Curated annotation (Swiss-Prot):
<dbReference type="GO" id="GO:0000725">
    <property type="term" value="P:recombinational repair"/>
</dbReference>
<keyword id="KW-0862">Zinc</keyword>
<feature type="zinc finger region" description="C4-type">
    <location>
        <begin position="59"/>
        <end position="74"/>
    </location>
</feature>
<keyword id="KW-0233">DNA recombination</keyword>
<comment type="similarity">
    <text>Belongs to the RecR family.</text>
</comment>
<dbReference type="InterPro" id="IPR023627">
    <property type="entry name" value="Rcmb_RecR"/>
</dbReference>
<keyword id="KW-0863">Zinc-finger</keyword>
<dbReference type="InterPro" id="IPR034137">
    <property type="entry name" value="TOPRIM_RecR"/>
</dbReference>
<comment type="function">
    <text>May play a role in DNA repair. It seems to be involved in an RecBC-independent recombinational process of DNA repair. It may act with RecF and RecO.</text>
</comment>
<dbReference type="InterPro" id="IPR006171">
    <property type="entry name" value="TOPRIM_dom"/>
</dbReference>
<dbReference type="Pfam" id="PF21176">
    <property type="entry name" value="RecR_HhH"/>
</dbReference>
<dbReference type="GO" id="GO:0006302">
    <property type="term" value="P:double-strand break repair"/>
</dbReference>
<dbReference type="InterPro" id="IPR000093">
    <property type="entry name" value="DNA_Rcmb_RecR"/>
</dbReference>
<dbReference type="GO" id="GO:0008270">
    <property type="term" value="F:zinc ion binding"/>
</dbReference>
<dbReference type="InterPro" id="IPR015967">
    <property type="entry name" value="Rcmb_RecR_Znf"/>
</dbReference>
<feature type="domain" description="Toprim">
    <location>
        <begin position="82"/>
        <end position="177"/>
    </location>
</feature>
<keyword id="KW-0234">DNA repair</keyword>
Length: 200
């Protein structure tokens, strides 16, 4: 069976299919929707993508992405400079910001240690984190890393490196999510929740 659309449209579909969460069928539907909504959607999207391409950059202080450098989080005077929240990637930073979970500042590692994937300490921004943690104003480093083997390995590695820094190193609690039912949780989550129980 031959191509259904011209090469330009097929190229659009192929590019959309590279996005996370979009397979070939979803990409084709998205492309059709964009084409049908050319004025209302495709043109503003094209403009926004061009602005992002021209202006978005990585913050030299924390690793966030923004249109200014240092980013708006790092330059916000309401942020507590005594707290650094360590995350694996920008998506985690954005999740914490949506939850309004902290008024501290961030440090984006870029990933977690993963020997199986060939990701070592030299591939992450751990050296910059250690340097920031040694600043006189920093009193706490919060490890907001995923509760995976790679996340825990990274947390232990960072904790060891920060032993000589005059900072408290904490990590996010792991356990029962809000609205979670015990019967649906895995054994590891239940064990972590039981170990990290708090007074009520």
């Amino acid at each position: 069976m031959g191509a259904v659309a011209g090469p330009e449209i097929e190229r659009l579909v192929q590019l959309l299919a590279r996005l996370p969460g979009l397979g070939p069928r979803s990409a084709r539907r998205a492309a059709l929707h964009l084409i049908k909504k050319r004025e209302a959607l495709m043109m503003p999207l094209s403009s926004a993508l061009q602005v992002a391409l021209d202006k978005v950059q990585v913050c030299k202080t924390c690793g966030n992405i923004d249109t200014q450098n240092p980013c708006t989080v790092c330059t916000d005077p309401k942020r507590d400079p005594a707290i650094i929240v360590v995350v694996a990637d920008v998506a985690d930073l954005w999740a914490l910001e949506r939850a309004n979970a902290t008024q501290g500042r961030y440090h984006v590692l870029g990933a977690t240690l993963s020997p199986l994937d060939g990701v070592g300490p030299q591939d992450l921004t751990i050296d910059a984190l250690v340097a920031r943690a040694h600043a006189a104003e920093v009193h706490e480093v919060i490890l907001a890393l995923n509760a995976t083997v790679d996340g825990q390995t990274t947390a232990h590695y960072i904790t060891d490196l920060l032993q000589d820094a005059n900072v408290k190193v904490t990590r996010l609690a792991h356990g029962v999510p809000v609205g979670g039912e015990l019967d649906y949780l895995d054994e590891g989550t239940l064990s972590a929740a039981m170990r990290q129980r708090t007074l009520f």
